[in-house]
Design a protein with these regions (language model features):
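A catalytic-pocket lid/entrance helix-loop region that shapes and gates access to the active site
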Residues: 1-55
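C-terminal subdomain of alpha/beta-hydrolase-fold enzymes, centered on the catalytic histidine
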Residues: 46-191
Protein backbone atom coordinates (compact mmCIF):
# COMPACT_ATOMS: atom_id res chain seq x y z
CA UNK A 1 0.00 0.00 0.00
CA UNK A 2 1.49 3.28 -1.10
CA UNK A 3 2.19 5.94 1.45
CA UNK A 4 1.87 3.95 4.68
CA UNK A 5 5.38 2.80 5.59
CA UNK A 6 6.90 4.87 8.42
CA UNK A 7 10.38 6.26 7.72
CA UNK A 8 11.89 4.31 10.63
CA UNK A 9 10.73 1.12 8.85
CA UNK A 10 11.30 2.03 5.20
CA UNK A 11 14.93 3.09 5.46
CA UNK A 12 16.23 -0.01 7.32
CA UNK A 13 14.18 -2.35 5.10
CA UNK A 14 15.65 -0.68 2.00
CA UNK A 15 19.25 -0.75 3.23
CA UNK A 16 19.14 -4.21 4.82
CA UNK A 17 19.66 -2.85 8.33
CA UNK A 18 17.96 -4.56 11.26
CA UNK A 19 14.39 -3.47 11.98
CA UNK A 20 13.70 -1.09 14.85
CA UNK A 21 12.98 -2.80 18.16
CA UNK A 22 9.50 -3.09 19.60
CA UNK A 23 7.62 -4.02 16.42
CA UNK A 24 4.37 -5.92 16.79
CA UNK A 25 4.04 -9.29 15.03
CA UNK A 26 2.10 -7.62 12.16
CA UNK A 27 4.68 -4.85 11.86
CA UNK A 28 7.57 -7.35 11.86
CA UNK A 29 5.83 -9.40 9.16
CA UNK A 30 5.32 -6.28 7.01
CA UNK A 31 8.95 -5.26 7.60
CA UNK A 32 10.14 -8.70 6.46
CA UNK A 33 7.95 -8.48 3.33
CA UNK A 34 9.33 -5.02 2.50
CA UNK A 35 12.93 -6.13 3.04
CA UNK A 36 12.32 -9.10 0.73
CA UNK A 37 10.79 -6.83 -1.93
CA UNK A 38 13.66 -4.36 -1.73
CA UNK A 39 16.18 -7.20 -2.10
CA UNK A 40 14.40 -9.36 -4.71
CA UNK A 41 11.71 -7.32 -6.43
CA UNK A 42 12.80 -3.72 -6.76
CA UNK A 43 14.94 -3.88 -9.91
CA UNK A 44 11.97 -3.88 -12.29
CA UNK A 45 10.46 -0.86 -10.50
CA UNK A 46 13.78 0.99 -10.62
CA UNK A 47 14.16 0.36 -14.35
CA UNK A 48 10.62 1.54 -15.06
CA UNK A 49 11.03 4.45 -12.64
CA UNK A 50 14.26 5.69 -14.18
CA UNK A 51 14.25 4.67 -17.84
CA UNK A 52 10.90 3.27 -19.01
CA UNK A 53 11.54 4.22 -22.63
CA UNK A 54 14.56 1.88 -22.73
CA UNK A 55 12.43 -1.25 -22.29
CA UNK A 56 12.30 -1.97 -26.00
CA UNK A 57 12.27 -5.73 -25.45
CA UNK A 58 8.75 -5.56 -24.06
CA UNK A 59 7.51 -3.55 -27.04
CA UNK A 60 9.36 -5.35 -29.82
CA UNK A 61 8.87 -8.98 -28.83
CA UNK A 62 5.88 -10.85 -27.44
CA UNK A 63 8.34 -13.24 -25.77
CA UNK A 64 10.18 -10.29 -24.20
CA UNK A 65 6.86 -8.91 -22.95
CA UNK A 66 5.77 -12.29 -21.55
CA UNK A 67 9.14 -12.71 -19.83
CA UNK A 68 8.91 -9.26 -18.25
CA UNK A 69 5.38 -9.83 -16.97
CA UNK A 70 5.94 -13.40 -15.81
CA UNK A 71 9.25 -12.89 -14.03
CA UNK A 72 9.52 -9.29 -12.90
CA UNK A 73 9.59 -10.08 -9.19
CA UNK A 74 9.91 -13.21 -7.08
CA UNK A 75 6.44 -13.12 -5.47
CA UNK A 76 4.62 -12.65 -8.77
CA UNK A 77 6.73 -15.39 -10.31
CA UNK A 78 5.78 -17.77 -7.48
CA UNK A 79 2.08 -16.94 -7.91
CA UNK A 80 2.19 -17.43 -11.68
CA UNK A 81 4.15 -20.68 -11.28
CA UNK A 82 1.44 -22.04 -8.98
CA UNK A 83 -1.27 -21.02 -11.47
CA UNK A 84 0.52 -22.64 -14.42
CA UNK A 85 0.88 -25.79 -12.28
CA UNK A 86 -2.91 -25.90 -11.98
CA UNK A 87 -3.39 -24.53 -8.45
CA UNK A 88 -6.40 -22.30 -7.78
CA UNK A 89 -5.21 -18.77 -7.10
CA UNK A 90 -8.10 -16.68 -8.41
CA UNK A 91 -6.49 -16.43 -11.83
CA UNK A 92 -6.18 -19.00 -14.56
CA UNK A 93 -3.43 -19.61 -17.08
CA UNK A 94 -5.75 -18.08 -19.71
CA UNK A 95 -6.21 -14.96 -17.57
CA UNK A 96 -2.46 -14.41 -17.52
CA UNK A 97 -2.05 -15.09 -21.24
CA UNK A 98 -5.01 -12.78 -21.98
CA UNK A 99 -3.31 -10.03 -19.97
CA UNK A 100 -0.07 -10.45 -21.92
CA UNK A 101 -2.07 -10.40 -25.17
CA UNK A 102 -3.88 -7.22 -24.15
CA UNK A 103 -0.59 -5.43 -23.50
CA UNK A 104 0.84 -6.76 -26.76
CA UNK A 105 -2.09 -5.91 -29.04
CA UNK A 106 -2.60 -2.45 -27.53
CA UNK A 107 1.17 -1.75 -27.49
CA UNK A 108 0.93 -0.30 -23.97
CA UNK A 109 3.68 -2.07 -22.01
CA UNK A 110 6.09 0.88 -22.03
CA UNK A 111 3.40 3.52 -21.56
CA UNK A 112 2.11 1.60 -18.53
CA UNK A 113 5.68 1.50 -17.18
CA UNK A 114 5.75 5.31 -17.18
CA UNK A 115 3.54 5.27 -14.08
CA UNK A 116 6.67 4.30 -12.16
CA UNK A 117 8.65 7.13 -13.76
CA UNK A 118 5.92 9.63 -12.92
CA UNK A 119 5.85 8.53 -9.28
CA UNK A 120 9.59 7.87 -8.84
CA UNK A 121 10.86 6.09 -5.76
CA UNK A 122 9.77 6.85 -2.23
CA UNK A 123 6.49 5.26 -3.24
CA UNK A 124 5.94 3.67 0.17
CA UNK A 125 6.77 6.81 2.19
CA UNK A 126 3.92 8.53 4.04
CA UNK A 127 2.08 11.16 2.04
CA UNK A 128 -0.11 12.50 4.88
CA UNK A 129 -3.41 12.00 3.11
CA UNK A 130 -6.12 14.04 4.85
CA UNK A 131 -9.27 12.73 3.14
CA UNK A 132 -11.26 9.66 4.23
CA UNK A 133 -9.38 6.48 3.34
CA UNK A 134 -10.37 2.80 3.22
CA UNK A 135 -7.65 0.15 3.37
CA UNK A 136 -7.98 -3.48 2.31
CA UNK A 137 -4.95 -5.63 3.04
CA UNK A 138 -4.47 -8.58 0.68
CA UNK A 139 -2.03 -11.27 1.91
CA UNK A 140 -0.07 -11.64 -1.34
CA UNK A 141 0.47 -7.91 -1.81
CA UNK A 142 4.05 -6.58 -1.72
CA UNK A 143 3.54 -6.05 2.00
CA UNK A 144 0.58 -6.39 4.35
CA UNK A 145 0.20 -2.96 5.93
CA UNK A 146 -0.52 -3.27 9.66
CA UNK A 147 -3.40 -1.23 11.04
CA UNK A 148 -0.93 0.87 13.05
CA UNK A 149 0.84 2.01 9.87
CA UNK A 150 -2.44 2.71 8.08
CA UNK A 151 -3.71 4.77 11.01
CA UNK A 152 -0.43 6.72 11.13
CA UNK A 153 -0.48 7.50 7.41
CA UNK A 154 -4.21 8.08 7.06
CA UNK A 155 -5.64 10.04 10.01
CA UNK A 156 -9.14 9.75 8.53
CA UNK A 157 -9.07 5.96 8.15
CA UNK A 158 -12.70 4.86 7.87
CA UNK A 159 -12.24 1.19 6.96
CA UNK A 160 -9.47 -1.35 7.52
CA UNK A 161 -9.77 -5.04 6.70
CA UNK A 162 -7.31 -7.93 6.28
CA UNK A 163 -8.44 -10.49 3.72
CA UNK A 164 -7.61 -14.17 3.33
CA UNK A 165 -6.69 -14.12 -0.37
CA UNK A 166 -5.63 -11.78 -3.13
CA UNK A 167 -2.46 -9.99 -3.99
CA UNK A 168 -0.87 -7.15 -5.91
CA UNK A 169 -3.54 -7.34 -8.61
CA UNK A 170 -6.45 -7.94 -6.23
CA UNK A 171 -9.15 -6.49 -8.50
CA UNK A 172 -8.04 -8.90 -11.23
CA UNK A 173 -7.28 -11.89 -8.99
CA UNK A 174 -10.30 -11.67 -6.68
CA UNK A 175 -12.89 -9.39 -8.32
CA UNK A 176 -15.76 -10.36 -6.02
CA UNK A 177 -13.74 -9.77 -2.86
CA UNK A 178 -12.37 -6.52 -4.24
CA UNK A 179 -15.88 -5.26 -5.10
CA UNK A 180 -17.11 -6.14 -1.61
CA UNK A 181 -14.20 -4.21 -0.10
CA UNK A 182 -14.88 -1.13 -2.24
CA UNK A 183 -18.50 -1.18 -1.08
CA UNK A 184 -17.49 -1.67 2.56
CA UNK A 185 -14.96 1.14 2.30
CA UNK A 186 -17.46 3.66 0.94
CA UNK A 187 -20.36 2.55 3.17
CA UNK A 188 -19.35 4.86 6.09
CA UNK A 189 -19.53 7.86 3.74
CA UNK A 190 -23.19 7.29 2.87
CA UNK A 191 -25.57 9.57 4.71
Amino acid sequence: MAGAVPDNIDKPAYTGAPPPSGLSADEQHAYDQLAFFYKHGLAFAQEMGNRPQTLYGIEDSPIGLASWILDHDARSYALITRIFAGQEEGLTRDDILDNITLYWLSNTAVSSARLYWENKLGFFSPKHVAIPVAVSVFPDEIYAAPRSWAEGAYPKLIHYNKLDKGGHFAAWEQPQLFSEEVRAGFRPLRK
